[in-house]
Amino acid sequence: MLAVSEDGKLVVAGSDSHGTAYGILEISRLLGVSPWEWWADVTPEKKETFRLSGKFRELQSPSVEYRGIFINDEDWGLMPWSNKTYEPSDVKGEIGPRTNERIFELLLRLRANTYWPAMHECTLPFFLTKAIGKQRKSMASLWELPTANQWRAMLPENGKYVEKEHTIT
């Protein structure tokens, strides 16, 4: 919920951490910031002022349960760009933490709640990347997980996708 209170204060509230984040990011949308601002080089138009009417109230809820991004065909696009250009790494097939942070930001801006990470054999599986600890904890607190401390992920194993359980520490 995004509303202007009787005393003129902007109120942002959500039913959970997602809803609150979406409410905060709705302000950026009202200001003209595209969810794709970083990925598509969409520079927001500068505004001198921004006002909401005293009666402004917006209440939104999702129309589908799972909304997210599935990283696919990363072997020719995302992974080499991340690994060689955006955050060079000696770890073969790694999509690094800075790239994942940008993906998570996009997910929030798009009001998503689900992330299906890259899973081709050439890519280091998301949950096996070195610098993922902070992101795991962030995801555990923000993204809906099957249980409080477990995430089921599909990992490439001998050319087949195998469901494995990972404990978030």
Region locations from a protein language model:
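Feature activates predominantly on carbohydrate-active enzymes
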Residues: 2-168
